[in-house]
Amino acid sequence: MKGSQASDDATGSLGPGRLQLPAMRVLVAPDCYGDSLSAVEAAAAIATGWTRSRPGDSFIVAPQSDGGPGFVEVLGSRLGETRRLRVCGPLNTVVNAAWVFDPGSATAYLECAQACGLGLLGGPPTPETALAAHSKGVGQLIAAALRAGAARIVVGLGGSACTDGGKGMIAELGGLDAARRQLADVEVIAASDVEYPLLGPWGTARVFAPQKGADMATVAVLEGRLAAWAIELDAAAGRGVSAEPGAGAAGGIGAGLLAVGGRYQSGAAIIAEHTHFADDLADAELIVTGEGRFDEQSLHGKVVGAIAAAARPLAIPVIVLAGQVSLDKSALRSAGIMAALSIAEYAGSVRLALADAANQLMGLASQVAARLGNSGPSGYR
């Protein structure tokens, strides 16, 4: 369907429409859009739609990830060999998980969402799936990386259906003691930009389990399970790993990785390093980024917020094209973002946006490109 005219009122101003700017270098750097579009698919849709209205612009297409869905796809397009492994999914069905091995550095890049992601449930999440989902497949991926001779294993955290604290993952490696022995000489990285602990009001069950189908009673059960498991994790590690930043990432898989000798590192920073994002940023006159839901959390430990923070000192304008937007003009100004526009608003509803996500994003990008003013990038702010 033809999209509606994007609103200026709540999400920043793009100025008068259909006035031509000189050709620009546009950095297209989105995260994934939930289960609707991978970062690679979203970047292609934005660039294609933009070109329809501004064919003279040049593009730097650099899809991003913070360790969640798309982490392996983004890295696979830049380095190493993408491999496939049939593993146990979050509800015990067999899934075909992708991972990347870079033989030059003997580094394996894994992604939790490939083995226990929400998109692998086979339907909407429910309290029952929230209780049953596990991380066994992640342990199977780690075992495969060890068999391949990995000296470094980077595990992208995010988008998981489980809240098991990595218990299933560790069970697949033979338990805590066996996992620690197997990984003693391997550098293990828990890649995420989620800094929440395992337990408590800001822990993984209370913050993230409701997004995985859990109701209040289910959250309480999950919290109790995690509290018991945390005692074992902390004892194995010899320190309080369950309270450390990142322990709550991916349903607590972060805590499991920390307990077997891993360390926490920003997933967005890992992707930025391997995609040479700093060089791309230096060449850009405008940045177009986006994600599924753009809200306050996006500005704290997610790709879009990290991009805006990096662009601000360089005075590079940033436009966000998101599935849904819940930040007002004041919040955008504070973050250094010129405008944020909603695909759902453009399409007419969330349902229509989800039904044809790539084409709706393409259409919104085309509309935004056509409506830019003629004062050049410096006039956007």
Swiss-Prot record:
Cross-referenced Pfam families: Gly_kinase (PF02595)
SUPFAM superfamilies tied to this protein: Glycerate kinase I (SSF110738)
Superkingdom, natural source: Bacteria
An MF annotation (GO) of this entry: glycerate kinase activity
GO biological process: organic acid phosphorylation
Record has Repressor as a keyword: no
Keywords: Kinase, Transferase
GO cellular component, one term: peptidoglycan-based cell wall
Keyword field contains Transferase: yes
UniProt family annotation: Belongs to the glycerate kinase type-1 family.
Record's protein name: Uncharacterized protein Rv2205c
Protein species of origin: Mycobacterium tuberculosis (strain ATCC 25618 / H37Rv)
